């Protein structure tokens, strides 16, 4: 990878200590965390407390307690904290957001967002598959499976594109594949602060699907649709 041996660290804790020991003009300025979910909170808090900017892959963490501790660390640090979601950087997503924000659709009334995958249609975690193993393990993934893994993308997309804040949810989570410890399929009914309603679907047992994300938003004067095919 072209990394100097002295900066190839055995752990995130060693990395932070090693970088803090370097002169200010040589040390890392930004730490990007793309570890499994259960290794999000501790390195984020330590990095922020150490003065490093943090870019963290979604989801934020695995519990409300961790989330509050991370929020406190971010507020008390002079460093910046960023939580990333894949699709908000797409040009057409930004255009969709702009169209709605500019009033082209009128007041938002309805939001439909779906994220189907099929890679967990079988008991893949039982086949020594590294990604499947940790993503379906409650100790590493958290309390939810598909909804936490890809439902977070759909939720983020619904709020980002529409400009609405989701304030009420009613969810049904299903575990379809026998032996799986977490949900692999789910649907959510939601309501926003303005009164708009919507439906969110996230599933990883839609055989044949990869990342065919789709969002539709309807307002008083019209609607729009974006699909990742």
What are these regions (language model features)?
Residues 33, 56, 62, 81-83, ...:
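Hydrophobic residues in well-ordered beta-strands that form the structural core
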Residues 14, 30, 42, 69, ...:
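Alpha-helical elements of Rossmann-like donor-binding domains used by nucleotide-donor carbohydrate transfer enzymes
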Residues 130, 149, 153-229:
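Contiguous beta-strand/loop segments that form the cofactor/metal-binding neighborhood of enzyme cores
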Residues 7-73:
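Beta-loop-alpha module in the N-terminal Rossmann-like domain of NAD(P)-dependent dehydrogenases
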């Amino acid at each position: 990878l072209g990394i100097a041996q002295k900066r190839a660290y055995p752990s995130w804790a060693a990395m932070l200590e090693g970088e803090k020991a370097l002169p200010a003009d040589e040390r890392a300025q930004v730490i990007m965390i793309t570890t499994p979910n259960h290794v999000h909170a501790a390195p984020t808090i330590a990095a922020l407390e150490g003065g490093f900017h943090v870019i963290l892959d979604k989801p934020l963490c695995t519990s409300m307690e961790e989330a509050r501790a991370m929020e406190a660390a971010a507020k008390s640090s002079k460093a910046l904290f960023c939580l990333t979601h894949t699709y908000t950087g797409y040009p057409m997503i930004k255009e969709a957001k702009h169209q709605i924000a500019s009033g082209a659709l009128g007041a938002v009334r309805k939001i439909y967002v779906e994220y189907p995958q099929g890679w967990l249609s079988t008991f893949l975690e039982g086949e020594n598959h590294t990604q499947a193993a940790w993503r379906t393990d409650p100790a590493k993934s958290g309390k939810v499976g598909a909804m936490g893994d890809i439902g977070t993308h759909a939720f983020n997309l619904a709020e980002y594109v529409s400009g609405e804040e989701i304030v009420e949810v009613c969810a049904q989570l299903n575990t379809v594949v026998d032996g799986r410890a977490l949900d692999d399929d789910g649907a959510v009914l939601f309501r926003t602060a303005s009164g708009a309603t919507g439906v969110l679907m996230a599933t990883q047992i839609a055989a044949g699907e990869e990342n065919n994300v789709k969002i539709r938003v309807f307002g008083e004067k019209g609607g729009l649709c974006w699909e990742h095919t």
